[in-house]
Amino acid sequence: MSFDINWNQLTIDDTINQSIKEFLDQQFKKISLPSFISNLSVTDFNLGEIPPEITIRHIGDPFEEFYEDEDNLGATNETNHNLNDERSTMGKSQENGIHKDNAYNSQNFDDDDDDDEGVDEDDDDDEYDDHDLGTINEGISLLNFNDSSTTPSGNSFGGSIAPLPPPPLNPSRDSFHSILHPYGVNSIIGATGAGSETPTNILNQNYLSSRVLPKISVKQKQPHHDDNDIQLIVEINYKGDMHINLLVNLLVNYPSPNFISLPIKLHITDIVIHSIATIAYLKKSVYLSFLCDVDDAFPDFDSNNNAQTPTSTTGGNFVDYYSNDAAINKERIDIVKKIKIESEIGEVENNILRNVGKVEKFLVEQLRNILRDEIAWPSWICIDMNDDGDDDDDDEVEDSNVSDGDGKDNDGKHGDGPTHEV
């Protein structure tokens, strides 16, 4: 199944470009820069006029991770309620014990009273022990819930699954390929409507862990399920004219630190992406996360040269970076498979230094790292499509819930259009 995208409606408002530019600029400013560059900033971003090719592979319910805050909030409230009940019960037991002690001291010490007192103490202990064991069981259930995976494989795709014991935690967030369809991604992509293989089992919940929380979200996660929520598993093939402009200073630290500072303008273009992604629509918010890359042969790779790892060109003002090393790609999703950088140092007419491959390679690696960390599963990015009037109702919730990975509040809103938060 395929559909056409009205790309002009997405790019006609520059608010989206501005929002993405500011988001990328914030991420680049968090990078620890090497000694030979400084003052890195994103000066421009544009989605371009060429849309990606998107093919729908499955339609179903959104992943439960998008609603995880609701469950955690309910579990936390239940735990606090049980804790308060336990404290209240313990307080009443202590008050009863004080009254009994006073009554006991006012009576004569005889054998019958001693026996009655012993029975009363045993009854109190039994009552407390039963309540204590109940609390332990509830804690174990809560622990199992928190440690178990929450990404549905059957439920999210309209199927049903039998209750399973909590699986062991996945020790690495870089092994998403292990939870893909057992016949491989290529089998899913190559499957036809008449074939027996479908993308229903593209995800296996037994290998996912909810302990890795996403890093980017406008409202973090949706607090409530809605009947209109929907999720698409899609194949994205992009070879468009998106471009990113960066500005950075190249430093010469000899004979002294920062002896010479040269401004470098970098133009990132020719971005190639071929991946499987999930797009979820939840209450006027769009969630996007890349699940895995699609392994295919790019003609440009084979026609250029037979080298396994191409090197940057010298003597020119652009350089291509890409890798066809299967061992590297299997370890982690790349998202960006090919990219080109054009560089300018100083004034264009006085451009003397051309070989800045070291700076370019560093920036490309950092760009890939940002995309992997922020929009590759189990992380995602959320675009809020709500109007300002709708947002007013949720301001109090957003102010209390939205924070970055360091616990700092960040509303992250840019203009009146879609917003991004960290």
Curated annotation (Swiss-Prot):
Organism superkingdom: Eukaryota
Kindly list the biological process annotations in GO that this record carries.
Answer: mitochondrial genome maintenance; mitochondrion-endoplasmic reticulum membrane tethering; phospholipid transport; protein insertion into mitochondrial outer membrane
Q: Which GO cellular component term is one of those annotated?
A: ERMES complex
Which InterPro entries does this UniProt record tie to the protein?
Mdm12, SMP_LBD
Q: Where is this region: Disordered?
A: 74-134, 387-422
Which ranges are annotated Basic and acidic residues under compositional bias?
A: 405-422
Mark out the compositionally biased spans (Acidic residues).
109-130, 387-401
Just give the chief location class.
Answer: mitochondrion
Give start-end ranges for the coiled-coil region(s): none
Q: Which UniProt keywords apply?
A: Endoplasmic reticulum, Lipid transport, Lipid-binding, Membrane, Mitochondrion, Mitochondrion outer membrane, Transport
PANTHER family documented for this protein: MITOCHONDRIAL DISTRIBUTION AND MORPHOLOGY PROTEIN 12 (PTHR28204:SF1)
Main function: Component of the ERMES/MDM complex, which serves as a molecular tether to connect the endoplasmic reticulum (ER) and mitochondria. Components of this complex are involved in the control of mitochondrial shape and protein biogenesis, and function in nonvesicular lipid trafficking between the ER and mitochondria. MDM12 is required for the interaction of the ER-resident membrane protein MMM1 and the outer mitochondrial membrane-resident beta-barrel protein MDM10.
Name recorded for this polypeptide: Mitochondrial distribution and morphology protein 12
What lineage does the source organism belong to?
Eukaryota, Fungi, Dikarya, Ascomycota, Saccharomycotina
Name of the coding gene: MDM12
